[in-house]
UniProtKB/Swiss-Prot annotation:
One of its GO terms (biological process) is lipid transport. The gene is LTP8. Disulfide bonds join C28-C76, C38-C53, C54-C98, C74-C112. Belongs to the plant LTP family. InterPro entries: Bifun_inhib/LTP/seed_sf, Bifunc_inhib/LTP/seed_store, Plant_nsLTP. One of its GO terms (molecular function) is lipid binding. It comes from the Eukaryota. SMART domains: AAI (SM00499). This is Non-specific lipid-transfer protein 8.
Length: 116
């Protein structure tokens, strides 16, 4: 086998076996993009959240795997929740009503220092 083929094989194997390390936590824009379909539900809705909202909640749950991601998402959610009036009961039940697990409720009173 020539040197180029060996390097190509090593490169391909490296893609699959070298662990990925995130340099930074999830961005607030990603959090907002995921939860944007939930805003009208959280502010004036009732019953179960719409499917598009739950899709965003599940996407966010999948994206917040590290402690840094969870804290960043918490800070973002808290800052947005402070700027709009959400129904507390809907915010608390959002993740469970969508069959997902988020690190925090969509609430302005959440304590982000305990998240992680």
């Amino acid at each position: 086998m020539n040197v180029l083929k060996c390097l190509a094989i090593i490169s391909v194997l490296g893609i699959f076996f070298i662990p990925r390390y995130s340099e930074s936590a999830i961005s607030c824009s990603v959090v907002l993009q995921d939860l944007q379909p939930c805003v009208s539900y959280l502010t004036s809705g009732s019953g179960n959240p719409p499917e598009t909202c739950c899709d965003g909640v599940k996407s966010l749950a999948a994206a917040t795997t590290t402690s840094a991601d969870k804290k960043a998402a918490c800070q973002c959610i808290k800052s947005v929740a402070n700027s709009v009036t959400v129904k507390p009961e809907l915010a608390q039940a959002l993740a469970s009503n969508c069959g997902a697990s988020l690190p925090v409720d969509a609430s302005p009173t959440v304590d982000c220092t305990t998240v992680g």
